[in-house]
Structure formats: C-alpha cells, structure tokens
C-alpha cells in the first residue's frame, strides 16, 4: 500500500497543508519543533485512530481551533481509497471511502504502518506495559478479530476489577457474579493469549535471520512470550484450556479478593528479547538493544506483508542518521522499491546515498512545507 496524498487541517501546528507523497522515500527536513514529527504522527493517527505520542485527542487540534482533520488517499493493488479522521473536542469520526465507521475495529487495518522512533528502544529496555502495547498495536493492524477479542477482554477485565474492589471493601459479599465474570473472562483471555503466542513465534522466525545478517552471524536473537496464564499445553483443546485457567482463578480467588484486583490474564503478559541466550533488557549493550529493535521492526514489515498481502508504510522518526552503515544497509534492503517510507531528519548527512537517490525531499518550517 502507498499513501498518495496527505491533507491536514488544524492538526497540531499545521493550519492547512497538502503533501503529495513519493511512492518510495519521503524525507522531511527541518530544525527541531517545526512540525516534522507532527506529520509522521498524523499518518500514524490516520492508520490507528490514535496518536503514539498522546492519549488525549484534544492535543491534536491546533491552538484556538475547534477541530482537526486528517485525510489520506491510499493506493492498494486493487485500487485507491480515501481515509478520513475528523477530531473535535467531543470525540472523533472516522470514514473509509467516505462512509462513516461506527466502530474503530471496522476502521483499523485499512492503512498499516510500522513506526521506528528513538523511544522504540523501550520495546527492549522498557516496562512490560510498553511491550504489551507494541504487541497490541501491531497485531491489531493485521487481525480485526484480535482487536475485537482484546476489546471484549478489556471490557470484562474492567467489570471484574470493579467487582473485586467491591468485595475487598465489603460492599459485596456474594461471589456468584464473580464466577459468571470469570467464565466470560477466560474465554477472551485465552483467545488473546493464544493469538499473541502465535504472533510472537511468527515474529521470531522473521526477525532471527535479519538480526543474524546485521551482526554478521555473531549474535542469535530469540523471543520468549511470557504469558501471565502459563498453560501446560498450548495445543490442548478449548475445553481443557478453559478448565485449566478456571482452576487457576478459583485457586487464587481469595488472593484476588484481598488485593481487589485481577492478578492473572493477558494484561500482565510480557515479552523477552534474548541475544545469545542473555536477556537484552538486563544484559544487552545499547548497540545490541538498537539492533534488536531494528530487527523486530523489519520483521514487522515482512509479517504484515505476509498476513495482509500489502507492505505497510514505514515511519522513521529521527532515527535514520543514528544507524551505522551496516544497519542502514539492512534497512535499505528491506524497503527498497517495496515499502513507502517517511523519514524525519534535521540533516541529510549520514543518510545512505542510495536512499537519497530514490527520495523526495520536503523542507518543513513553522508548520509549512516550503517549495
């Protein structure tokens, strides 16, 4: 897939701008705080109906404006399609081909993106919450079923936590409702857990040769899914898995009542990256962590193409010039002539000349694209 045009109205520091996009590489050059990252963010937001930089949509609306609008025309193998996102201080509206979508699960997946920014090192060295969000953002783009199952799980988790809190403080004493919630909870917890486990295996298979290539076969990368629900046999039938998880919850019912919170489930999952058998979060150098993050991002690109049949759009926010020649070479081999890429940078120095030869440059200054 390709983004042909991007139009912004009252988005961040942009009053009104239209970007005619190059099908291969688009390089956004400018000093800091001029709006380069805002442009990349708008593409990400158009794809996932949420920003990666803020959870408050109101922050996306230009100062003293009542609304923000993002519109993009996409090209697929089978044709073109417009996507629109309209944001007000009361909420947001999304459209596919000019038709409003009542649920975000119907919208997400029409535009797939992979973002690589300096903070993506936190996927390796940050908290479990960051890694869970990474899994959900990437998996949600390629599976509407997963996105729906995750939403159902989060809804039931919230209900269960509310009831556990009432039991803890004595507002409720009957655990019958909790047993009903656990039945629903287990159904979706298993769906999320099993899909995540499969996703991590697929990602590992694709990331390992990429990582080996970047390190000249000096390092081996493995990914370990660390689920909160440690199932004895992931291949068991559904009824056996449900019985196993229900037994776990029943055995820990008193602990959950005392704590007033759900102690088991995908909301407590983690993911471990290991380089030569050592946990990269604890023992990896910054170079190893950067290589691991890059390998994962490049593997995401390939996985999305396998699952969706279209390459995603790659967003590189101020990271290209930080990659050494070896890493840039492997990045180039992945994206060249296949993946439309948007790059932000303060200078083109240090960017591979082959990337520059297939690029269109845009100079960004104070929320405007200079011709």
Swiss-Prot record:
Superkingdom of source: Bacteria
Subcellular locations according to the entry: Cytoplasm
Record-level Gene Ontology MF annotations: ATP binding; single-stranded DNA binding
GO biological process: DNA replication; DNA synthesis involved in DNA repair; double-strand break repair; SOS response
UniProt binding sites for ATP: 30-37
Known role: The RecF protein is involved in DNA metabolism; it is required for DNA replication and normal SOS inducibility. RecF binds preferentially to single-stranded, linear DNA. It also seems to bind ATP.
UniProt similarity note: Belongs to the RecF family.
The name this protein goes by in its record: DNA replication and repair protein RecF
Organism: Staphylococcus epidermidis (strain ATCC 12228 / FDA PCI 1200)
Classification of source organism: Bacteria, Bacillati, Bacillota, Bacilli, Bacillales
Gene that encodes the chain: recF
């Amino acid at each position: 897939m390709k983004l042909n045009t991007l139009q912004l109205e009252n988005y961040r520091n942009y009053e009104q701008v239209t970007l005619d996009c190059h099908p291969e590489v688009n390089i956004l050059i400018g000093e800091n705080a001029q709006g380069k990252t805002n442009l990349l963010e708008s593409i990400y937001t158009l794809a996932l109906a949420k920003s990666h930089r803020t959870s408050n949509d109101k922050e996306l609306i230009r100062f003293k404006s009542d609304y923000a609008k993002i519109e993009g025309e996409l090209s697929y193998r089978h044709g073109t399609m417009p996507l629109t996102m309209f944001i007000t201080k009361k909420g947001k509206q999304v459209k596919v081909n000019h038709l409003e979508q009542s649920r975000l699960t119907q919208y997400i997946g029409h535009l797939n993106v992979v973002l690589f920014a300096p903070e993506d090192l936190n996927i390796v060295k940050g908290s479990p919450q960051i890694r869970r969000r990474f899994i959900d953002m990437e998996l949600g783009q390629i599976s509407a079923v997963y996105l729906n199952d995750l939403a159902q799980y989060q809804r039931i988790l919230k209900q269960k936590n509310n009831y556990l809190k009432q039991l803890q403080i004595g507002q409720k004493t009957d655990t019958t409702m909790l047993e009903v919630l656990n039945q629903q909870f287990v159904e979706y917890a298993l769906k999320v857990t099993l899909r995540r486990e499969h996703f991590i295996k697929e990602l590992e298979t694709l990331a390992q040769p990429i990582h080996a290539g970047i390190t000249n076969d000096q390092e081996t990368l493995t990914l370990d899914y660390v689920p909160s629900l440690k199932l004895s046999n992931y291949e068991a039938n559904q009824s056996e898995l449900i019985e196993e998880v229900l037994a776990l919850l029943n055995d820990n019912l008193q602990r959950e009542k005392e704590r007033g919170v759900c102690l088991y489930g995908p909301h407590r999952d983690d993911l471990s990256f290991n380089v030569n058998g050592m946990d990269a979060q604890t023992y990896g150098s910054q170079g190893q962590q950067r290589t691991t993050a890059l390998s994962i991002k490049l593997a995401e690109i390939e996985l999305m193409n396998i699952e969706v049949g279209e390459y995603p759009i790659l967003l590189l926010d101020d990271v290209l010039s930080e990659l050494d020649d070896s890493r840039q070479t492997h990045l180039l081999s992945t994206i060249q002539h296949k993946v439309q890429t948007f790059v932000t940078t303060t200078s083109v120095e240090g960017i591979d000349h082959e990337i520059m030869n297939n690029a269109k440059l845009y100079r960004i200054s104070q929320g405007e694209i200079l011709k």
